[in-house]
């Protein structure tokens, strides 16, 4: 069976949805028709009663014949009306029943002429006229609220339609990405089978690079499609979750409307009608009861009918008469797209944190709303009781008018002094209408609040059920998660960026032109962070954040860092929102130029917001394209944020209040108080109608805001951003030609990617260019030549052709005399079994507090915290999948982190070379004295190299030395305390081996090379080739595996290397670089590379 017959098409799903919406719309229209018909029926009834009593008052002067005719006249009229049919169908309403009994009793009336005429004319008819006015007024107010309810229902259904289409779109993209991934896997398998059939002996030596290239291309394509599939799958999951949540909210809102709101709406239409009508009839009964005893039997029947005037019974009767109109419709069902089997909210790991945070926010919001709504309900009940007291005043007794001792004049005076006097009428009517107005205001507030609680409660219950199942599933008590885990995307750190133009308080256009970022990093990162963790945050952009944290985030952005890449557990949402507002508020040129202020304000003259779209669009078209792109991105985000106003309480108007003064500055000479309201209205209009105002991506290229964003773990490099920069350590000309080409052996390399140098010392080259390498300057840089110019070449952008592990061999030879070697690992086995295990933290042993400020690498250098799961080093040739995008030259530093350990991690050959390199250059201080001597040596060296910088360098070194000594003493104390607490003999600890005094101290520090620049000189390539087969499988390290007794199988992971700019070194000094007087990196620089001597290095 084909996929067309299995799954519904998008058009069919949309057609079914539109049909269901059309049916609901029809029901809503019919409801108002029914209520309007009921109101007209009541008005007709009241008009008939007024006419009846008016005629009866006139006819009371006549005799019983006229009264009999009157009764017969209305009886015949009723027999031909619809109410007569209702009576047959047992749908007789209580007011109609009273009317029937009155007519029946009228036939017995033949007496009481003048008194009854006075009472009917001055009392009963006036009451009926007031009731008619009340019916019309109450129906109009109820209709307004009903229309608002209908609009809310249609708005909810429209939102459900939008979310459903978004879900369909992302799911289609996920299916497409999955098919492409399968196609890539088939190509890889086909290529693998094809290469296996050929004999290695029959292939020529020059054909092998071509096969490797084809394999790498296929692997690149597979990895790229794998990443695309993972990203689309995550977006699809988020879109489906939103769809299901909106689906639950929509069904809950519709169900509440049909079950509760319609009933309450009918109650509003009936408010006071039955009570007022009862008073009128009781007035009539009071007059009639004083008539002759012969009428008592018939009047008792009427009294019983009046006592049975019941608004609830009539309401149920009306709803039973029109059961098809008032019955709730069918619930909206989840419409799976293209066979999607997941029909519930997914709480897997990529979205579990977000859902949990959203659940707690909903819980807090619901608690507040329920308290507020309960208070409103109490006020509503009290107001209703007051209204009932007003409407049930017992002022219908007119027995005094029938006293035989009184004259006609006394009867008139008594009537004038009673309730129906004009003064009392005006006073009572004013009080009643004022109370009614307050009641309707509170009723509207209560209905809106209860609707909001119903929707949020539905989401809350669904999230509670989902998260509860997820927790139980993790404990192994219920079924596994709905979706199988998909391959995760390799995380890549956001690069560091430093530009010549200011980010804050500068020109945004100049910054965008300089950086190449279509959206400034601070805006893009803050919006992404709020999208992931703050859409449900109450009062976002209105509640201020911590000023200290705002300044910290701002300073990080100004340094070119992105502090929000992986800090969702540390950053406050309100502080991030404050940074976003701070950035736009401090721009040198506001987002909306002051020159167009009057033009924008003039659009407010159009009362309809939809009519303002075209004038605003024509004004914004005149702005620069880069500004329009930023505006489009920002206002799309604000519109998305306003869609969660039920939870975050930030509708478009509230957002406009927050962003109006930020985005549109009021020019000098204008009254800020009077203009601010107009500014807010302009911003509100743009937020609501941003799609119609700003050009589409086809009309204007640039990044577009996406509602479903990936988290920090999946954060990829933006296609609109530029690679980060590395500041120079030495600002001298770094491209000085080498004095001799024969001092070192030249190594040939091929460029894997295009690279543009960001300083005079860095070389620029194209992909496939041939490069000459002199020696390895650091982990990430080579000294080399291209097109006759010497300079630095990034290691991650090249493939070394004829160096096969020579760099690792030279370091291994140097390390043999200094450190004990690690276990020998087979190269092939390590390449096959290079598996990533979950990262652990040593928080149980107190390392979080000891190493909270400084993380020590195996070579003794302090390294910043990095996100786990990614590696900044390129894999060795022929091993592992290659990366499809150029690696960044600089990594983004962040706050210190605990030391991670990997269980069962088998390191790749390239990482073993990095570990060997780190251990070769390490320096162990035997005691604090040696540490102080090293610091003083560094201070002396720094003063000789940078004597022109002044005395502040020595003060900085002293402060740094004091800080280092304090940190080391604290670390030693806590680690020794841990050692004393452990009863089992522990294996040597990495940190203890680094910090504790050694029994056999090494030779003088000056005898060891302090920098890799002194050892990376390949003089005998043949010898390196001879040793490559054996030394490539070795992993040289200064320390033994840490915590081997505590964590079985735990092995140190090589720390991620950050590209540190090597110092300037000419080739003429390479042969003597291992001497004491060489300008190498001092021990303190290796421990803390971010000190004063490295301030101009990588940020």
From Swiss-Prot:
CDD domains in alphabetical order: F-BAR_srGAP3, RhoGAP_srGAP, SH3_srGAP1-3
Record field: compositional bias (Low complexity): 1060-1074
GO CC annotation terms, alphabetical: glutamatergic synapse
Assigned keywords, A-Z: Coiled coil, GTPase activation, Phosphoprotein, SH3 domain
UniProt-listed SMART domains: FCH, RhoGAP, SH3
List of residues that carry Phosphoserine: 817, 820-821, 837, 858, 954
One BP annotation, GO: signal transduction
Molecular functions per Gene Ontology: GTPase activator activity
Recorded coiled-coil stretches: 352-392, 952-987
SH3 domain boundaries: 744-803
Region (Disordered): 470-493, 809-846, 861-911, 994-1014, 1045-1099
Domain F-BAR: 19-314
Pfam family, one: FCH
PANTHER family the UniProt entry points to: SLIT-ROBO RHO GTPASE ACTIVATING PROTEIN
Subunit record text: Homodimer. Forms a heterooligomer with SRGAP1 and SRGAP2 through its F-BAR domain. Interacts with WASF1. Probably interacts with ROBO1. Interacts with FASLG.
Function as written in the Swiss-Prot or TrEMBL entry: GTPase-activating protein for RAC1 and perhaps CDC42, but not for RhoA small GTPase. May attenuate RAC1 signaling in neurons.
Protein name: SLIT-ROBO Rho GTPase-activating protein 3
Species name: Mus musculus (Mouse)
Gene from which this protein is expressed: Srgap3
């Amino acid at each position: 069976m084909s996929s067309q017959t299995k799954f519904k098409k998008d058009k069919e799903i949309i057609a079914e949805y539109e049909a269901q919406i059309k049916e609901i719309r029809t029901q809503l229209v019919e409801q108002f028709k029914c209520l309007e018909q009921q109101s007209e029926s009541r008005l007709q009834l009241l008009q008939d009663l007024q006419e009846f009593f008016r005629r009866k008052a006139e006819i009371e002067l006549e005799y019983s014949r006229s009264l009999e005719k009157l009764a017969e006249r209305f009886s015949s009229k009723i027999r031909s009306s619809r109410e007569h049919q209702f009576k047959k169908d047992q749908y007789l309403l209580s007011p109609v029943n009273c009317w029937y009994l009155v007519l029946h009793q009228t036939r017995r009336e033949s007496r009481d002429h003048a008194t009854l005429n006075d009472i009917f004319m001055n009392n009963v008819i006036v009451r009926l006229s007031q009731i008619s006015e009340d019916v019309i007024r109450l129906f109009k107010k109820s209709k307004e609220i009903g229309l608002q309810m209908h609009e809310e229902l249609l708005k909810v259904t429209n939102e459900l339609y939008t979310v459903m289409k978004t879900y369909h779109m992302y799911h289609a993209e996920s299916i497409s990405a999955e098919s492409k991934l399968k196609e890539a896997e088939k190509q890889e398998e086909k290529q693998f089978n094809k290469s296996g059939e050929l004999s290695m002996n029959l292939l020529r030596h020059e054909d092998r690079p071509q096969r490797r290239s084809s394999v790498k291309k296929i692997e690149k394509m597979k990895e790229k499609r794998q990443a695309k599939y993972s990203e689309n799958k995550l977006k699809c999951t988020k879109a489906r979750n939103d769809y299901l949540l909106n689906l639950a909210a929509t069904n809950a809102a519709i169900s509440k409307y049909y079950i509760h709101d319609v009933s309450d709406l009918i109650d509003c239409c009936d408010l006071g009608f039955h009570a007022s009508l009862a008073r009128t009839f009781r007035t009539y009964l009071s007059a009639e009861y004083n008539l002759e005893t012969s009428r008592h039997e018939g009047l008792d029947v009427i009294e019983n009918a009046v006592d049975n005037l019941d608004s609830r019974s009539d309401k149920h009767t009306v709803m039973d008469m029109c059961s098809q109109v008032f019955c709730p419709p069918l619930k909206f069902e989840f419409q799976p797209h293209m066979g999607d089997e997941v029909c519930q909210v997914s709480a897997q790991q990529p979205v579990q944190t977000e859902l949990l945070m959203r659940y707690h926010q909903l819980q807090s919001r619901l608690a507040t709303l329920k308290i507020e709504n309960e208070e409103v309900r109490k006020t509503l009940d009290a107001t209703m009781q007051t209204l009932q007291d007003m409407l049930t005043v017992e002022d219908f007794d007119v027995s005094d008018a029938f006293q035989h001792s009184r004259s006609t004049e006394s009867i008139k005076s008594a009537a004038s002094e009673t309730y129906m006097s004009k003064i009392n009428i005006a006073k009572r009517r004013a009080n009643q209408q004022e109370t009614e107005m307050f009641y309707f205001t509170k009723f509207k507030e209560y209905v809106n609040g209860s609707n909001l609680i119903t929707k949020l409660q539905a989401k809350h219950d669904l999230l509670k059920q989902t998260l509860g199942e997820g927790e139980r599933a993790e404990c192994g008590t219920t079924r596994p998660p709905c979706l199988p885990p998909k391959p995760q995307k390799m995380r890549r750190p956001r690069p560091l960026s430093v530009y010549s133009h200011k980010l804050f308080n500068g020109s945004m256009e100049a910054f965008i032109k300089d950086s190449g970022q279509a959206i400034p990093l601070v805006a893009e990162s803050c919006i992404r962070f709020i999208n992931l963790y703050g859409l449900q945050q109450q009062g976002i952009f209105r509640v201020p954040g911590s000023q200290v944290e705002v300044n910290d985030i701002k300073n990080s952005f100004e340094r070119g860092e992105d502090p929000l890449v992986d800090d969702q557990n540390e950053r406050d949402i309100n502080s991030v929102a404050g940074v976003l507002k701070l950035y736009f508020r401090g721009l040198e040129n506001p987002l909306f130029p002051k020159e167009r202020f009057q033009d924008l304000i003039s659009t407010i003259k159009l009362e309809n917001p939809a009519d303002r779209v075209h004038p605003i669009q024509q004004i914004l078209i005149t702005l620069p394209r880069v500004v329009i792109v930023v505006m489009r991105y920002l206002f799309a985000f604000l519109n998305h944020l306003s869609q969660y106003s039920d939870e975050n309480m930030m509708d478009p108007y509230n957002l406009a209040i927050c962003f109006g003064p930020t985005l549109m500055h009021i020019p000098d000479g204008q009254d800020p108080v009077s203009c601010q309201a107009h500014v807010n209205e302009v911003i509100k209009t743009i937020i609501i109608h941003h799609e119609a105002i700003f050009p589409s991506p086809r009309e204007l290229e640039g990044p577009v805001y996406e509602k479903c964003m990936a988290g920090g773990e999946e954060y990829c490099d933006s296609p609109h951003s530029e690679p980060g920069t590395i500041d120079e350590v030495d600002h001298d000309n770094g491209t000085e030609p080498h004095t001799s080409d024969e001092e070192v052996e030249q190594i040939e390399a091929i460029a894997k990617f295009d690279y543009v140098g960001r300083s005079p010392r860095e070389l620029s080259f194209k992909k496939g260019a041939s490069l000459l390498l002199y020696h390895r300057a650091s982990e990430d840089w080579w000294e080399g030549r291209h097109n006759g110019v010497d300079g630095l070449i990034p290691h991650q952008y090249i493939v070394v052709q004829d160096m096969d592990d020579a760099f690792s061999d030279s370091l291994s030879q140097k390390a043999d005399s200094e450190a004990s070697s690690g276990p020998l690992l087979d190269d092939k086995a390590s390449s096959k079994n290079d598996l990533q295990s979950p990262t652990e933290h040593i928080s149980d042993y107190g390392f979080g507090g000891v190493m909270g400020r400084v993380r020590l690498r195996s070579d003794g250098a302090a390294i910043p915290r990095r996100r786990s799961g990614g590696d900044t080093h390129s894999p060795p040739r022929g091993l592992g999948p290659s990366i499809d995008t150029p690696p960044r030259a600089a990594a983004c530093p962040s706050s210190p982190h605990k030391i991670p350990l990997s269980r069962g991690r088998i390191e790749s050959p390239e990482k073993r070379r990095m570990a060997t390199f780190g251990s070769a250059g390490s320096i162990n201080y035997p005691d604090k004295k040696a540490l102080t001597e090293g610091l003083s040596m560094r201070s002396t060296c720094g003063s000789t190299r940078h004597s022109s910088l002044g005395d502040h360098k020595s003060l900085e070194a002293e402060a740094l030395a004091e800080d280092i000594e304090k940190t080391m003493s604290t670390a030693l104390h806590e680690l020794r305390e841990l050692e004393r607490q452990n009863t089992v003999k522990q294996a040597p600890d990495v940190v203890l081996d680094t910090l504790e005094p050694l029994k056999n101290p090494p030779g003088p520090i000056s005898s060891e090379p302090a920098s890799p620049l002194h050892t990376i000189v390949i003089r005998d390539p043949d010898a390196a080739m001879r040793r490559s087969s054996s030394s490539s499988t070795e992993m040289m390290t200064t320390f033994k595996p840490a915590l081997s007794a505590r964590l079985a199988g735990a092995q140190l992971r090589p720390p991620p290397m950050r590209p540190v700019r090597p110092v300037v070194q000419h080739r003429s000094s390479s042969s003597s670089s291992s001497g004491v007087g060489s300008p190498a990196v001092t021990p303190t620089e290796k421990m803390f590379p971010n000190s004063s001597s490295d301030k101009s290095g990588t940020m």
